[in-house]
Protein backbone atom coordinates (compact mmCIF):
# COMPACT_ATOMS: atom_id res chain seq x y z
CA UNK A 1 0.00 0.00 0.00
CA UNK A 2 2.83 2.41 0.90
CA UNK A 3 4.42 1.73 -2.49
CA UNK A 4 1.14 2.47 -4.32
CA UNK A 5 0.69 5.76 -2.40
CA UNK A 6 4.26 6.74 -3.22
CA UNK A 7 3.70 6.06 -6.93
CA UNK A 8 0.42 8.01 -6.86
CA UNK A 9 2.08 11.06 -5.26
CA UNK A 10 4.85 10.92 -7.87
CA UNK A 11 2.31 10.72 -10.70
CA UNK A 12 0.34 13.70 -9.35
CA UNK A 13 3.50 15.77 -8.89
CA UNK A 14 4.62 14.91 -12.41
CA UNK A 15 1.30 16.04 -13.85
CA UNK A 16 1.63 19.59 -12.49
CA UNK A 17 2.54 22.16 -15.12
CA UNK A 18 6.18 23.16 -15.07
CA UNK A 19 6.80 26.75 -13.98
CA UNK A 20 7.88 28.96 -16.86
CA UNK A 21 11.54 29.98 -16.95
CA UNK A 22 13.00 33.43 -17.55
CA UNK A 23 12.45 34.76 -21.08
CA UNK A 24 15.24 35.05 -23.63
CA UNK A 25 17.51 38.02 -23.03
CA UNK A 26 17.13 37.93 -19.24
CA UNK A 27 20.09 36.56 -17.30
CA UNK A 28 18.66 35.87 -13.85
CA UNK A 29 20.58 36.69 -10.69
CA UNK A 30 19.86 35.49 -7.17
CA UNK A 31 17.91 38.74 -6.66
CA UNK A 32 15.79 38.09 -9.76
CA UNK A 33 14.96 34.59 -8.56
CA UNK A 34 14.11 35.92 -5.09
CA UNK A 35 11.67 38.43 -6.61
CA UNK A 36 9.95 35.73 -8.63
CA UNK A 37 9.73 33.37 -5.65
CA UNK A 38 8.21 36.12 -3.48
CA UNK A 39 5.56 36.93 -6.09
CA UNK A 40 4.70 33.28 -6.62
CA UNK A 41 3.94 33.07 -2.90
CA UNK A 42 0.49 34.01 -1.72
CA UNK A 43 0.70 37.49 -0.23
CA UNK A 44 2.57 40.74 0.27
CA UNK A 45 3.63 43.73 -1.80
CA UNK A 46 7.16 44.11 -3.18
CA UNK A 47 9.26 47.26 -3.71
CA UNK A 48 12.18 46.54 -6.03
CA UNK A 49 14.92 49.15 -6.01
CA UNK A 50 18.62 49.30 -6.75
CA UNK A 51 21.47 51.45 -7.94
CA UNK A 52 21.60 52.78 -11.49
CA UNK A 53 22.38 49.99 -13.94
CA UNK A 54 21.25 47.05 -11.77
CA UNK A 55 18.63 45.83 -14.25
CA UNK A 56 15.35 47.04 -12.78
CA UNK A 57 13.76 47.48 -16.22
CA UNK A 58 14.99 44.07 -17.36
CA UNK A 59 13.54 42.44 -14.25
CA UNK A 60 10.20 44.18 -14.81
CA UNK A 61 10.00 42.81 -18.36
CA UNK A 62 10.88 39.33 -17.16
CA UNK A 63 8.37 39.30 -14.31
CA UNK A 64 5.67 40.57 -16.65
CA UNK A 65 5.92 37.29 -18.56
CA UNK A 66 6.23 35.05 -15.51
CA UNK A 67 3.71 36.36 -12.97
CA UNK A 68 0.59 34.20 -12.94
CA UNK A 69 -2.72 36.05 -12.88
CA UNK A 70 -4.20 39.22 -14.34
CA UNK A 71 -2.00 42.29 -14.03
CA UNK A 72 -1.82 45.90 -15.17
CA UNK A 73 1.29 48.07 -15.49
CA UNK A 74 1.08 51.77 -14.68
CA UNK A 75 3.54 54.66 -14.39
CA UNK A 76 3.35 58.27 -13.18
CA UNK A 77 4.22 59.92 -16.53
CA UNK A 78 3.10 59.40 -20.10
CA UNK A 79 6.59 58.69 -21.43
CA UNK A 80 7.36 56.21 -18.64
CA UNK A 81 4.07 54.43 -19.37
CA UNK A 82 4.87 54.20 -23.11
CA UNK A 83 8.38 52.90 -22.39
CA UNK A 84 7.08 50.14 -20.12
CA UNK A 85 4.08 49.26 -22.27
CA UNK A 86 1.53 50.35 -19.70
CA UNK A 87 -0.91 53.13 -18.84
CA UNK A 88 -0.51 56.28 -16.77
CA UNK A 89 -1.76 56.12 -13.20
CA UNK A 90 -3.97 59.16 -13.79
CA UNK A 91 -5.61 57.59 -16.84
CA UNK A 92 -6.06 54.11 -15.36
CA UNK A 93 -7.67 55.37 -12.15
CA UNK A 94 -9.35 58.48 -13.59
CA UNK A 95 -7.45 60.85 -11.30
CA UNK A 96 -7.00 64.61 -11.83
CA UNK A 97 -3.51 66.01 -12.63
CA UNK A 98 -3.23 67.84 -9.29
CA UNK A 99 -3.20 67.20 -5.56
CA UNK A 100 -5.74 64.42 -4.98
CA UNK A 101 -8.51 64.91 -2.42
CA UNK A 102 -11.04 62.40 -1.00
CA UNK A 103 -13.82 63.71 -3.27
CA UNK A 104 -11.73 62.73 -6.33
CA UNK A 105 -12.05 59.01 -5.58
CA UNK A 106 -14.95 57.58 -7.57
CA UNK A 107 -16.14 54.44 -9.27
CA UNK A 108 -14.14 54.08 -12.45
CA UNK A 109 -14.87 52.99 -16.00
CA UNK A 110 -11.97 50.60 -15.38
CA UNK A 111 -13.88 48.94 -12.53
CA UNK A 112 -14.21 45.67 -14.45
CA UNK A 113 -10.45 45.57 -14.96
CA UNK A 114 -9.75 46.40 -11.32
CA UNK A 115 -12.02 43.63 -10.07
CA UNK A 116 -10.00 41.05 -12.02
CA UNK A 117 -6.53 42.23 -11.05
CA UNK A 118 -4.22 40.08 -9.02
CA UNK A 119 -1.16 42.32 -9.45
CA UNK A 120 -0.63 46.01 -10.11
CA UNK A 121 2.89 46.83 -11.34
CA UNK A 122 3.98 50.45 -10.76
CA UNK A 123 7.10 51.62 -12.59
CA UNK A 124 9.07 54.72 -11.52
CA UNK A 125 7.26 54.55 -8.18
CA UNK A 126 9.82 56.93 -6.69
CA UNK A 127 8.02 59.71 -8.63
CA UNK A 128 4.64 58.79 -7.14
CA UNK A 129 3.51 61.15 -4.37
CA UNK A 130 1.89 59.91 -1.18
CA UNK A 131 -1.51 61.34 -2.17
CA UNK A 132 -1.43 59.38 -5.42
CA UNK A 133 -0.53 56.13 -3.66
CA UNK A 134 -3.36 56.78 -1.20
CA UNK A 135 -5.71 57.35 -4.16
CA UNK A 136 -4.63 54.06 -5.76
CA UNK A 137 -5.46 52.28 -2.50
CA UNK A 138 -8.85 53.95 -2.12
CA UNK A 139 -9.84 53.49 -5.76
CA UNK A 140 -9.06 49.77 -5.67
CA UNK A 141 -11.03 49.32 -2.44
CA UNK A 142 -14.10 51.06 -3.90
CA UNK A 143 -14.01 49.55 -7.38
CA UNK A 144 -13.33 46.02 -6.15
CA UNK A 145 -15.97 46.18 -3.41
CA UNK A 146 -13.39 45.23 -0.76
CA UNK A 147 -13.32 48.35 1.39
CA UNK A 148 -11.57 46.75 4.37
CA UNK A 149 -8.60 45.37 2.42
CA UNK A 150 -5.56 47.51 1.57
CA UNK A 151 -5.53 48.10 -2.20
CA UNK A 152 -8.71 46.04 -2.40
CA UNK A 153 -6.69 42.84 -2.10
CA UNK A 154 -4.47 43.58 -5.13
CA UNK A 155 -0.75 42.89 -4.71
CA UNK A 156 1.61 45.70 -5.71
CA UNK A 157 4.94 45.22 -7.48
CA UNK A 158 6.77 48.55 -7.39
CA UNK A 159 9.95 49.53 -9.24
CA UNK A 160 11.98 52.68 -8.70
CA UNK A 161 14.97 54.34 -7.08
CA UNK A 162 14.40 57.13 -4.57
CA UNK A 163 18.05 58.14 -5.02
CA UNK A 164 17.33 59.13 -8.63
CA UNK A 165 13.81 60.37 -9.31
CA UNK A 166 11.92 62.02 -6.45
CA UNK A 167 8.30 63.15 -6.83
CA UNK A 168 7.63 66.68 -8.04
CA UNK A 169 6.08 68.59 -5.11
CA UNK A 170 5.28 72.30 -5.13
CA UNK A 171 5.66 74.30 -1.93
CA UNK A 172 1.91 74.66 -1.41
CA UNK A 173 1.47 70.88 -1.78
CA UNK A 174 4.27 69.92 0.59
CA UNK A 175 2.48 71.21 3.69
CA UNK A 176 -0.69 69.22 2.91
CA UNK A 177 1.27 66.03 2.17
CA UNK A 178 3.30 66.37 5.36
CA UNK A 179 0.24 66.98 7.52
CA UNK A 180 -1.92 64.29 5.90
CA UNK A 181 0.53 61.48 5.21
CA UNK A 182 3.72 62.42 7.02
CA UNK A 183 5.63 63.22 3.83
CA UNK A 184 5.48 63.43 0.03
CA UNK A 185 6.96 60.02 -0.80
CA UNK A 186 4.90 57.02 -1.91
CA UNK A 187 5.94 54.95 1.10
CA UNK A 188 4.15 57.41 3.40
CA UNK A 189 0.77 56.07 2.24
CA UNK A 190 -0.62 54.10 5.23
CA UNK A 191 -2.03 51.17 3.21
CA UNK A 192 1.49 49.94 2.42
CA UNK A 193 1.90 49.19 6.13
CA UNK A 194 -1.49 47.52 6.59
CA UNK A 195 -2.31 43.86 6.10
CA UNK A 196 0.36 41.75 4.40
CA UNK A 197 3.70 43.52 4.72
CA UNK A 198 5.40 45.39 1.90
CA UNK A 199 8.84 43.88 1.42
CA UNK A 200 12.00 45.47 0.03
CA UNK A 201 14.33 43.90 -2.53
CA UNK A 202 17.43 45.91 -3.43
CA UNK A 203 19.19 44.65 -6.55
CA UNK A 204 22.90 44.34 -5.84
CA UNK A 205 24.64 43.48 -9.12
CA UNK A 206 25.64 46.46 -11.28
CA UNK A 207 25.58 45.65 -14.99
CA UNK A 208 26.36 49.13 -16.39
CA UNK A 209 29.79 49.69 -14.83
CA UNK A 210 32.62 47.28 -14.07
CA UNK A 211 35.23 49.80 -12.85
CA UNK A 212 35.38 49.28 -9.06
CA UNK A 213 36.63 52.83 -8.41
CA UNK A 214 33.74 54.39 -10.35
CA UNK A 215 31.22 52.09 -8.67
CA UNK A 216 32.59 53.06 -5.23
CA UNK A 217 32.42 56.79 -5.96
CA UNK A 218 28.93 56.51 -7.47
CA UNK A 219 27.73 54.69 -4.35
CA UNK A 220 28.98 57.58 -2.21
CA UNK A 221 27.29 60.14 -4.48
CA UNK A 222 24.10 58.08 -4.34
CA UNK A 223 24.11 58.12 -0.54
CA UNK A 224 25.08 61.79 -0.20
CA UNK A 225 28.34 60.80 1.50
CA UNK A 226 30.95 62.17 -0.90
CA UNK A 227 34.46 62.64 0.48
CA UNK A 228 37.20 64.99 -0.67
CA UNK A 229 38.91 61.96 -2.21
CA UNK A 230 35.75 61.09 -4.17
CA UNK A 231 35.56 64.64 -5.54
CA UNK A 232 39.22 64.35 -6.49
CA UNK A 233 38.54 61.23 -8.56
CA UNK A 234 35.67 62.91 -10.39
CA UNK A 235 37.32 66.31 -10.80
CA UNK A 236 40.36 64.73 -12.43
CA UNK A 237 37.95 64.32 -15.37
CA UNK A 238 37.50 68.09 -15.90
CA UNK A 239 38.23 68.94 -19.55
CA UNK A 240 37.21 71.74 -21.90
CA UNK A 241 34.86 70.29 -24.48
CA UNK A 242 37.02 71.54 -27.36
CA UNK A 243 39.91 69.33 -26.24
CA UNK A 244 37.75 66.21 -26.49
CA UNK A 245 36.95 66.64 -30.17
CA UNK A 246 33.40 67.34 -31.30
CA UNK A 247 33.55 64.24 -33.48
CA UNK A 248 33.84 61.99 -30.45
CA UNK A 249 30.52 60.55 -29.25
CA UNK A 250 30.29 62.62 -26.08
CA UNK A 251 26.77 63.53 -25.00
CA UNK A 252 26.48 66.74 -22.99
CA UNK A 253 24.18 66.29 -19.98
CA UNK A 254 22.70 69.43 -18.47
CA UNK A 255 20.06 70.07 -15.78
CA UNK A 256 17.70 72.21 -17.87
CA UNK A 257 15.81 71.70 -21.10
CA UNK A 258 16.51 75.28 -22.21
CA UNK A 259 20.28 74.73 -22.17
CA UNK A 260 20.01 71.37 -23.96
CA UNK A 261 17.85 72.90 -26.70
CA UNK A 262 20.20 75.86 -27.09
CA UNK A 263 23.24 73.59 -27.49
CA UNK A 264 21.51 71.30 -29.99
CA UNK A 265 20.16 74.25 -31.95
CA UNK A 266 23.57 75.93 -32.18
CA UNK A 267 25.35 72.79 -33.39
CA UNK A 268 22.62 72.01 -35.92
CA UNK A 269 22.66 75.58 -37.25
CA UNK A 270 26.44 75.42 -37.70
CA UNK A 271 26.20 72.44 -40.06
CA UNK A 272 26.20 73.30 -43.77
CA UNK A 273 23.17 72.76 -45.96
CA UNK A 274 19.43 72.92 -45.52
CA UNK A 275 17.56 71.15 -42.75
CA UNK A 276 14.92 68.51 -43.41
CA UNK A 277 11.86 68.17 -41.18
CA UNK A 278 10.26 64.77 -40.61
CA UNK A 279 6.71 64.87 -39.23
CA UNK A 280 5.53 62.08 -36.96
CA UNK A 281 2.27 60.27 -37.64
CA UNK A 282 0.08 60.32 -34.54
CA UNK A 283 -3.15 58.34 -34.36
CA UNK A 284 -5.71 57.69 -31.64
CA UNK A 285 -5.00 58.77 -28.07
CA UNK A 286 -1.34 59.68 -27.59
CA UNK A 287 -0.65 62.56 -25.22
CA UNK A 288 1.95 65.08 -26.40
CA UNK A 289 3.79 64.77 -23.08
CA UNK A 290 4.40 61.09 -23.87
CA UNK A 291 6.03 61.68 -27.27
CA UNK A 292 9.38 59.84 -27.16
CA UNK A 293 10.96 62.23 -29.66
CA UNK A 294 10.07 65.39 -31.55
CA UNK A 295 6.83 65.38 -33.51
CA UNK A 296 8.60 67.62 -36.02
CA UNK A 297 12.12 66.14 -36.16
CA UNK A 298 14.60 68.58 -37.75
CA UNK A 299 17.81 66.99 -39.10
CA UNK A 300 20.82 67.73 -41.30
CA UNK A 301 23.58 65.47 -42.63
CA UNK A 302 26.27 65.45 -39.93
CA UNK A 303 23.82 65.78 -37.03
CA UNK A 304 24.74 63.88 -33.88
CA UNK A 305 21.79 61.74 -32.79
CA UNK A 306 20.92 59.16 -30.16
CA UNK A 307 18.96 56.03 -31.05
CA UNK A 308 15.86 55.53 -28.93
CA UNK A 309 14.96 51.91 -29.62
CA UNK A 310 16.85 48.61 -29.60
CA UNK A 311 17.37 47.23 -33.10
CA UNK A 312 15.81 43.81 -33.78
CA UNK A 313 19.01 42.80 -35.63
CA UNK A 314 21.16 44.03 -32.71
CA UNK A 315 23.01 46.64 -34.78
CA UNK A 316 22.37 49.26 -32.10
CA UNK A 317 20.64 49.67 -28.75
CA UNK A 318 18.68 52.37 -27.00
CA UNK A 319 21.36 54.98 -26.24
CA UNK A 320 23.71 54.33 -29.18
CA UNK A 321 25.22 57.53 -30.61
CA UNK A 322 25.22 57.93 -34.40
CA UNK A 323 25.71 60.50 -37.16
CA UNK A 324 23.18 61.33 -39.84
CA UNK A 325 24.87 60.82 -43.22
CA UNK A 326 22.08 61.23 -45.77
CA UNK A 327 18.50 62.47 -45.87
CA UNK A 328 15.75 62.01 -48.43
CA UNK A 329 11.99 62.37 -48.31
CA UNK A 330 10.90 59.93 -45.59
CA UNK A 331 14.35 58.26 -45.53
CA UNK A 332 17.25 58.63 -43.08
CA UNK A 333 20.72 57.07 -43.18
CA UNK A 334 23.06 56.99 -40.18
CA UNK A 335 26.66 56.01 -39.45
CA UNK A 336 27.59 53.97 -36.37
CA UNK A 337 31.31 53.29 -35.89
CA UNK A 338 31.98 53.57 -39.61
CA UNK A 339 29.06 51.38 -40.70
CA UNK A 340 26.17 52.83 -42.70
CA UNK A 341 22.56 51.92 -41.91
CA UNK A 342 19.23 53.04 -43.28
CA UNK A 343 16.88 53.82 -40.42
CA UNK A 344 13.20 53.00 -40.57
CA UNK A 345 10.38 54.67 -38.71
CA UNK A 346 8.98 52.77 -35.74
CA UNK A 347 5.71 53.00 -33.85
CA UNK A 348 5.34 53.57 -30.13
CA UNK A 349 2.04 52.51 -28.63
CA UNK A 350 -0.14 54.12 -25.99
CA UNK A 351 -1.91 51.30 -24.18
CA UNK A 352 -5.08 50.85 -22.18
CA UNK A 353 -6.45 47.93 -20.19
CA UNK A 354 -9.87 46.37 -20.76
CA UNK A 355 -11.82 43.40 -19.45
CA UNK A 356 -12.49 40.76 -22.12
CA UNK A 357 -15.89 39.26 -21.24
CA UNK A 358 -15.50 36.24 -23.53
CA UNK A 359 -12.04 35.31 -22.28
CA UNK A 360 -12.81 36.47 -18.73
CA UNK A 361 -9.44 38.17 -18.35
CA UNK A 362 -7.72 41.55 -18.45
CA UNK A 363 -6.29 42.40 -21.88
CA UNK A 364 -4.15 45.22 -23.26
CA UNK A 365 -5.52 47.39 -26.04
CA UNK A 366 -3.73 49.97 -28.20
CA UNK A 367 -5.28 53.40 -27.66
CA UNK A 368 -2.95 55.31 -29.96
CA UNK A 369 0.35 55.25 -31.85
CA UNK A 370 3.22 57.65 -32.49
CA UNK A 371 5.30 56.81 -35.59
CA UNK A 372 8.62 58.54 -36.15
CA UNK A 373 12.32 57.83 -36.74
CA UNK A 374 13.64 56.52 -33.40
CA UNK A 375 16.20 59.22 -32.71
CA UNK A 376 16.68 62.70 -31.33
CA UNK A 377 19.47 65.28 -31.53
CA UNK A 378 22.19 64.30 -29.08
CA UNK A 379 24.83 66.95 -28.79
CA UNK A 380 23.03 67.57 -25.50
CA UNK A 381 20.32 65.91 -23.38
CA UNK A 382 18.73 66.91 -20.11
CA UNK A 383 19.76 64.78 -17.15
CA UNK A 384 16.10 63.81 -16.75
CA UNK A 385 15.80 62.56 -20.35
CA UNK A 386 19.04 60.60 -19.93
CA UNK A 387 17.61 58.70 -16.95
CA UNK A 388 17.64 55.00 -17.80
CA UNK A 389 20.23 55.34 -20.58
CA UNK A 390 23.69 53.77 -20.67
CA UNK A 391 26.20 55.98 -22.51
CA UNK A 392 29.82 55.35 -23.49
CA UNK A 393 30.95 58.98 -23.31
CA UNK A 394 29.33 61.65 -21.15
CA UNK A 395 30.21 65.34 -20.78
CA UNK A 396 28.51 66.84 -17.73
CA UNK A 397 27.72 70.55 -17.82
CA UNK A 398 26.00 71.49 -14.55
CA UNK A 399 26.18 75.24 -15.21
CA UNK A 400 25.01 77.01 -12.06
CA UNK A 401 24.43 73.70 -10.33
CA UNK A 402 21.81 71.04 -9.75
CA UNK A 403 18.40 71.83 -8.28
CA UNK A 404 16.96 68.44 -7.30
CA UNK A 405 17.74 65.46 -5.08
CA UNK A 406 19.61 62.76 -7.02
CA UNK A 407 20.31 64.87 -10.12
CA UNK A 408 24.11 64.66 -9.90
CA UNK A 409 23.90 60.90 -9.28
CA UNK A 410 21.72 60.35 -12.35
CA UNK A 411 24.13 62.34 -14.54
CA UNK A 412 27.30 60.64 -13.32
CA UNK A 413 25.85 57.12 -13.36
CA UNK A 414 24.92 57.22 -17.07
CA UNK A 415 28.52 56.50 -18.05
CA UNK A 416 30.04 53.04 -18.31
CA UNK A 417 33.55 54.04 -17.18
CA UNK A 418 35.69 56.81 -15.73
CA UNK A 419 37.57 56.96 -19.03
CA UNK A 420 34.35 57.95 -20.79
CA UNK A 421 33.42 60.65 -18.26
CA UNK A 422 34.28 64.34 -18.62
CA UNK A 423 33.20 67.37 -16.58
CA UNK A 424 32.83 70.97 -17.76
CA UNK A 425 33.84 72.27 -14.31
CA UNK A 426 34.83 70.77 -10.95
CA UNK A 427 32.00 69.10 -9.04
CA UNK A 428 31.21 70.79 -5.72
CA UNK A 429 29.71 69.36 -2.55
CA UNK A 430 26.65 71.58 -3.01
CA UNK A 431 26.02 70.03 -6.44
CA UNK A 432 25.20 66.75 -4.71
CA UNK A 433 21.73 67.35 -3.28
CA UNK A 434 20.59 64.56 -0.98
CA UNK A 435 17.24 64.39 0.83
CA UNK A 436 17.55 62.06 3.83
CA UNK A 437 13.75 61.88 4.10
CA UNK A 438 13.66 59.98 0.79
CA UNK A 439 15.40 57.08 2.53
CA UNK A 440 12.53 56.54 5.00
CA UNK A 441 11.44 53.35 3.25
CA UNK A 442 14.48 51.55 4.67
CA UNK A 443 12.96 51.70 8.15
CA UNK A 444 9.49 50.60 7.03
CA UNK A 445 9.83 47.54 4.80
CA UNK A 446 11.37 44.19 5.77
CA UNK A 447 14.03 42.94 3.36
CA UNK A 448 13.49 39.92 1.11
CA UNK A 449 16.14 37.28 1.77
CA UNK A 450 18.10 36.12 -1.27
Residue ranges and their predicted role:
Residues 1-450:
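Conserved ATP-binding/catalytic motifs of P-loop helicase motor domains
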